[in-house]
Amino acid sequence: MGALVLTGCSERQEASTTLPTTEAAPTTEALPTLGPADFPVPEEAREQTPEGAVEFVRYYVALTKHLAVNSRDPEPLLQLSQDCRTCNQIAQALTADLAASYSYREYAYEFDEYGPALVDGETAEVGFAYVQGPITAVDQAGQIVPDRSAATPEELQSGASLLWNEDLQSWVITGLTVG
């Protein structure tokens, strides 16, 4: 009986003409686009990490400029926030600018994070310095609108509270303090 088993294993076998594939099935799907089509939320800002939280706030600040300079509907600011009073005020100001046909000749700012975000599960806190200005808003006649402009740069100690939104696979801002 033992001889049969050994003999069967020692017989010559033809090699397979096909090799197993080494391609792995994709483990993650691409994230759906979030934000305006011409200024989407970058992938690194959609990571549930301290770095991702900082990049999300950096993006949100840049989005505000993008919408203002391009005279665009501020709806993306609202879509990327949740119960954020300051976010709502910014969106209302941009809506008022659109209604008044204001445009921006100049819109400079700097965003400097204080370090990594503090992440605790589904929430994060990001501290940053926001240097605003110069910003020059003009009316239809090209006249400067003083209450929508800032002639000299001003550093404002700022911060943001974030919540991870599983449906969006992104952070959303729940609180924003500028200054």
Could you tell me what each predicted segment is?
Residues 35-106:
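Core segments of small alpha/beta cavity-forming domains
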Residues 13-14, 121-179:
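Exposed beta-sheet edge and beta->alpha loop/turn motif
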Residues 110-119, 162:
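Short amphipathic beta-strand and strand-loop transition segments with alternating hydrophobic
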Residues 99-105, 115-116, 150-152:
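Short alpha-helical linear motifs
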Residues 2-55:
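Juxtamembrane and targeting peptides
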Residues 16-17, 104-109, 118:
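Short alpha-helix boundary/capping motifs
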Residues 94-95, 110-114, 144-145:
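Short structured motifs
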Residues 27, 109, 153-155:
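Short solvent-exposed loop/turn micro-motifs enriched in small/polar/acidic residues
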